């Protein structure tokens, strides 16, 4: 009975949104083929979080826009680095992913050995889950619309084709290195 209420659905949205967003990110990488998977997505989210907490505590970052830009920028930079290693150094994606996982777990523990930190005042209400309509739902809706728009692009078609048959994709003139980097 509690789940089928405004508060129940509000709490559900808060709990599942990070998982849905991580799934969107992982799906593109898996679609790239060659047994690609990103084992480090959890530690990467943790890394972004622990560094953000340190930056907030030091007063170096406070604006909601700056926080979102920081989180997205660090995520993109990490994924580009991993993609460049996979594409140009030619290390298997699972090895690169596992190395990133282990590195980030260690770095996260060094940065913050135990849970601590502050939540910005503007974000305090986000975790209450007392209503269905929250900023977390807005983020989920924007991400879902972005996913559907991206699925209509030529890049997405090339990504599906590359995941199905990389050699045929290459012979049809698609720059598979660029598509793989874009997938990350």
Predicted regions: what they are:
Residues 28, 54, 59, 80, ...:
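Membrane-interface helix caps of multi-pass small-molecule transporters
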Residues 60-101, 144:
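Alpha-helical transmembrane segments within multi-pass membrane transporters and channels
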Residues 3-14, 60-66, 124-136:
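Interfacial loop-to-helix junctions that mark the boundaries of transmembrane helices
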Residues 46-50, 75, 101-102, 143, ...:
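Residue-level recognition of pore/gate-forming positions within transmembrane alpha-helices
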Residues 89, 93-153, 179-182:
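Transmembrane helix-bundle core of multi-pass membrane transporters
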Residues 65, 78-81, 131-184:
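Helix-loop-helix "hairpin" substructures at the membrane interface of multi-pass membrane proteins
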Residues 18-19, 47-50, 99-109, 171-173:
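Small-residue-rich segments of transmembrane alpha-helices in multi-pass membrane proteins
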Residues 6-59:
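Single transmembrane alpha-helix segments in multi-pass membrane proteins
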């Amino acid at each position: 009975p509690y789940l089928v209420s405004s508060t129940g659905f509000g709490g559900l949205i808060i709990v599942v949104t990070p998982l849905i967003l991580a799934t969107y990110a992982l799906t593109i990488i898996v679609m790239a083929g060659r047994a690609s998977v990103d084992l480090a997505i959890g530690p990467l989210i943790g890394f972004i979080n622990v560094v953000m907490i340190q930056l907030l505590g030091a007063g170096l970052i406070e604006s909601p826009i700056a926080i979102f830009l920081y989180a997205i920028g660090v995520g993109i930079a990490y994924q580009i680095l991993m993609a460049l290693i996979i594409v140009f150094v030619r290390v298997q994606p699972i090895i690169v992913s596992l190395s990133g996982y282990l590195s980030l777990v260690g770095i996260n523990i060094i940065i913050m050995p135990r849970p601590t930190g502050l939540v910005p005042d503007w974000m305090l209400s986000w975790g209450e889950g007392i209503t269905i309509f929250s900023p977390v739902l807005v983020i989920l809706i924007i991400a879902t619309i972005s996913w559907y728009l991206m699925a209509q692009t030529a890049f997405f078609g090339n990504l599906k084709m590359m995941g199905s048959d990389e050699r045929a994709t290459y012979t049809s003139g698609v720059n598979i290195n660029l598509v793989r980097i874009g997938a990350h």
